[in-house]
Amino acid sequence: MLLSIKNVTKNYSQVQALAGINLEIRSGGVFGLVGPNGAGKSTLMKILATLTAPTDGTCELDGVNIQKQPNAIRRVLGYLPQDAAVYPNLTAVEFLEYISSLKSVDARAAKRQINDLLEIFNLSQYKKRRLSDYSGGMRQRVGISAALLGDPQVLIVDEPSVGLDPVERINLRNLLMQLAKERIVLLSTHIISDIEQTATELALIQKGRLLFSGSPSEFTQNTAGDMEKAYLQYMTNE
């Protein structure tokens, strides 16, 4: 699968959130989208999830314009927004069952997948508690689980590691790398360590402009493999 972003620009009133972004995101590896807060990453994610339209440019999934034919991506999309909402009066199981019904996932398959996801994210023992009793990190894990329901072929996750402890971050990283073998996985983050051992390709965005796109080795070719140092160099030169 190929997700193509072609000269995408997004304007909000007098503010340009994105300026002529061109990227190609393929299945087979995690694509990391990095940049500081406010760089335009979440805006691009929302465009790809067809929650907002670009002011100019197009996005295509295997050659199909997703702005003109949004179902081309919606039917295969798993999306975790930066501020994922959950229903506080529901338990984790109830919430995930509700999301699976919205995605038209077979009930028996959904039950198995929900149990597996709760186990992966160490939530099984809390699955009957209301989400209002969960910590922020626990709710984030539920949100990630919701994005993974239905075995999406395009997975877009925006700042997924927020609130996760180190072990949970490792589990998430390993899961994303496994999933990316057969699908598109786009990971947006401002934390370089999130993509350091995860991404096979990455792009750096700052102030709505694309500063770099390529492999991690290309990104760090002038810093002896040090990704944090390379990131700081790009930010300083900017």
Predicted regions: what they are:
Residues 97, 101, 108-126:
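Conserved ABC ATPase "signature" region
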